[in-house]
Structure formats: C-alpha cells, structure tokens
Amino acid sequence: MAVADPIARLVKELAKLPGIGEKTAQRLAFHILKAGAGYAGDLAAAIAGVVRDVRLCSTCQTLTDQDPCAICRDPERDARMICVVEGVPDLLAVERTHEFRGRYHVLHGALSPLDGVGPSDLKIRELLVRLEREPADEIVVATNPDVEGEATALYLTKLLKPMGLKVTRIAQGVPMGGDLEYADQVTLARALAGRREL
C-alpha cells in the first residue's frame, strides 16, 4: 500500500536532512501528523522564521537574528582575543565550556582541496578585514583535529603570523578525526586551556 502523496512528499523532504534516513523521516512525518495541525503550523512557522530572520553577524560571521550578535556586543568579552572555528556548532561547543571569554570568528568550513574548498570559499577575507578594523593580540585556532582542520590552521598561521599576531592552536585532547561539536565539556575545556602557539 502506497502512502498518500502529501505524506510521501514530507518524507522525501525530511530525508534530505543530515543524519535522517527514509525510515526516520517516515517516523517524523507520522509524528507530525499525530501531533496535529497546531504542532505542524508551529513547526512550519519556526522553520520559516529561521530562514527569514537569521543572518550572518557582520563581525564574526556566526548565525544571529541581531547584528552584531550577542557575543560581539558583549562588553565583558575580550575583543583582543579571537577564537577561529569552522562552524557555528563548534562555537556553541566552546561556549558550553565557559572557559573562553574572548570573541569568535566562524569560517563556515575548512580547507579541503579534494572537495574543491579553497580559501575564497571560507570567511577568511572577512577575518583579515576585521583584524584591520579591530586589532587583536591573539588568534586561537580551534579548527577540528582532522586533515582539513590542520590544513586550515597552517594556512591561517602563515597569513596571520606576519601581521605580528600571537597565533595559538587548541591543545590536542579532542581525538584526531573528531568534531568539536561532539566533544565533552571537560575535554574541550582542557584543550582550550592547553592551547599552544603555532
């Protein structure tokens, strides 16, 4: 027996989400149906609101509904220390440690020549423009400890060291090939505390 076309369309769209296969998409679709029109409307409104209202912070490139974002507006943050991360989930992981009181810069990826991702595909130019406008003392490179993250860290070091900046790398403690997003808070806090100069 085939499912109704509207259900099939919903399953097809949900299955496009990362980590969601067809069976999980089908379970989610039936959950939405069971929850009722109110829930479905709220979910649709939340999705539409994210697409409509969320944009990049003009300073750090994180996702925000206000520009500049809350972290960039916070006068208690050390504006002279910038933690460079690959993505917003990495920023959130570092924030959960409550160990870093500087500001951030989100690259939105890592260098990956095999995948066709070069420096111009990342928010590196925006970082350089930001540093001209707002000088910093230290750049903490917190890219993932994998081949792409290491390549990105080395590339950033070669760009930033000649500018007279102290460039540090978070200490290894996060396993090689792992993502910051999935690291526990203690491991990530130790990695931040043990960062090293590049």
Curated annotation (Swiss-Prot):
SUPFAM superfamilies, A to Z: Recombination protein RecR
GO molecular function, one term: zinc ion binding
One of the GO biological process terms: DNA recombination
InterPro entries linked to this entry: DNA_Rcmb_RecR, Hlx-hairpin-Hlx_DNA-bd_motif, Rcmb_RecR, Rcmb_RecR_Znf, TOPRIM_dom, TOPRIM_RecR
Disulfide bonds, paired cysteine numbers: none
Domain named Toprim: residues: 80-175
Keyword Ion transport in record: no
Keyword Zinc: yes
Protein name: Recombination protein RecR
Native source species: Anaeromyxobacter dehalogenans (strain 2CP-C)
